[in-house]
């Protein structure tokens, strides 16, 4: 018996050695590579958000039309997430990520020279679809290749690359647009992205634990329908849709409001306002800790209420109130989103990766629909219209959270 236990331990140790462990050179290379991939993806994805007021003037389009430069990109990303995850099961993780990240980075350079807004939108649609090949596969790669005890650190580093990239892209574009032009900003970011692509392809270790599987559409469809029949999961998907819709709406049209009288803020300052995203890094972690103590539905409810309070604080004219409101709004959003996404994985009883993909699909679909629809309210009613629309989405979210609280035992 002792011999068998010893052999079992030796076998387990050998298996752990096969996986990438924290503290090894391979771990550092893999994590820096995926950090770079996450940074590139979200820096380029949201690159047009601070530029919406510029697009309305340069291309002579409405704010709603300008917002499509982001909404259509996240829409194609949403559909791409459902496709690339399945394709990678057959074609491999690193291959698809490498192809997608190079194509998407090159497209940023092409977008910079778009002679018309229609062409810009077409390129952004293709770019969003290409970038879907990163988030849908990166976590699967980490789960397969990283040793279990090191996985939490690896996931955290990858997600930090996402958030820092999204923040850096917005700040960089706002600053370079003021100093030179938005075209120069895109050329700079596109060039940085291509350099990072080369590093990613060199540094990311090849998959050792990936097992190719033939595409089987029927089991995927059965699993999909099973998730969509679960009332708790459907409610969580809808919460993702409405929360992200409200979040993108506020940040899409905040720039328009702050370039108008009595504020007249520059693109640089508007770009730096996105630094409030940093409070989301804290709230997402803190809410996760509190969720274990007080329950996940209650924390999602708390985050949504904070978003409502934040939106209401943006209504007074003094910019101080608007900035405090945006901080509270952002704090609540990231807290609620982190707990809701975790509850999806916790509640799903099978095919957890697919359930998470459906959550992300709803999340980015909300970004597309909410961001574009919010433009109609901005054009018709100004900032009060944007806040009214956002409050409506958040009230629906509150009702859905109460439904989850009633149905879920979490």
PLM features: what roles do these ranges have?
Residues 96-109, 298-312, 391:
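Structural signature of the two symmetry-related core transmembrane helices
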Residues 79-118:
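Conserved MFS/SLC helix-loop-helix module at the cytosolic interface between two early adjacent transmembrane helices
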Residues 297-340:
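C-terminal transmembrane helical hairpin of 12-TM major facilitator-type secondary transporters
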Residues 16-24, 205-237:
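Juxtamembrane intracellular "pre-TM" segments in multi-pass secondary transporters
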Residues 119, 148, 157-204:
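Helix-loop-helix hairpin linking two adjacent transmembrane segments in secondary transporters
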Residues 123-164:
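Cytoplasmic helix-loop-helix junction between adjacent transmembrane helices
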Residues 60, 92, 113-119, 130, ...:
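Helix-breaking motifs and short loop linkers at transmembrane-helix boundaries and internal kinks
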Residues 103, 107-110, 118-126, 320-328:
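Paired small-residue
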């Amino acid at each position: 018996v002792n011999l068998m236990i010893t052999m079992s331990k030796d076998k387990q140790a050998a298996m752990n050695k096969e996986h990438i462990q924290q503290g090894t050179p391979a771990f550092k290379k893999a994590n820096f590579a995926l950090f770079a991939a996450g940074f590139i993806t979200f820096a380029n994805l949201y690159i047009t958000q601070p530029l919406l007021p510029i697009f309305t003037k340069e291309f002579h389009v409405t704010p709603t039309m300008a917002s499509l430069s982001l909404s259509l990109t996240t829409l194609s990303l949403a559909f791409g997430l459902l496709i690339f995850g399945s394709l990678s099961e057959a074609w491999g993780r690193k291959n698809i990520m490498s192809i997608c990240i190079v194509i998407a980075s090159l497209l940023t350079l092409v977008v910079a020279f778009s002679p018309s807004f229609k062409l810009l939108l077409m390129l952004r649609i293709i770019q969003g679809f290409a970038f879907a090949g990163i988030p849908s596969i990166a976590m699967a790669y980490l789960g397969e290749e990283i040793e279990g005890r090191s996985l939490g650190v690896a996931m955290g580093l990858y997600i930090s690359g996402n958030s820092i990239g999204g923040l850096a892209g917005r700040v960089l574009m706002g600053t370079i647009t003021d100093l030179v032009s938005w075209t120069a900003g895109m050329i700079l970011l596109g060039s940085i992205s291509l350099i990072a692509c080369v590093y990613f392809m060199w540094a990311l270790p090849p998959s050792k634990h990936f097992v190719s599987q033939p595409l089987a559409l029927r089991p995927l469809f059965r699993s999909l329908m099973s998730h969509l029949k679960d009332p708790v999961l459907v409610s969580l998907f809808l919460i993702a849709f409405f929360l992200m819709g409200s979040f993108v709406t506020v940040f899409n049209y905040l720039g328009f409001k702050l370039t108008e009288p009595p504020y007249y803020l520059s693109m640089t300052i508007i770009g730096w306002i996105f630094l409030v995203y940093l409070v989301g890094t804290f709230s997402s972690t803190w809410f996760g800790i509190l969720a274990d103590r007080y329950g996940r539905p209650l924390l999602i409810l708390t985050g949504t209420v904070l978003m409502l309070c934040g939106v209401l604080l943006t209504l007074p004219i003094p910019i101080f109130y608007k900035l405090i409101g945006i901080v509270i709004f952002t704090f609540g959003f990231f807290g609620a989103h982190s707990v809701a996404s975790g509850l999806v994985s916790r509640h799903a009883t099978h095919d957890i990766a697919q359930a998470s993909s459906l959550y992300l699909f709803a999340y980015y679909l909300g970004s597309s629909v909410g961001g574009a629809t919010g433009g109609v309210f901005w054009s018709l009613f100004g900032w009060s219209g944007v806040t009214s629309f956002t409050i409506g989405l958040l009230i629906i979210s509150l009702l859905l959270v109460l439904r989850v609280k009633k149905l879920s035992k979490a």
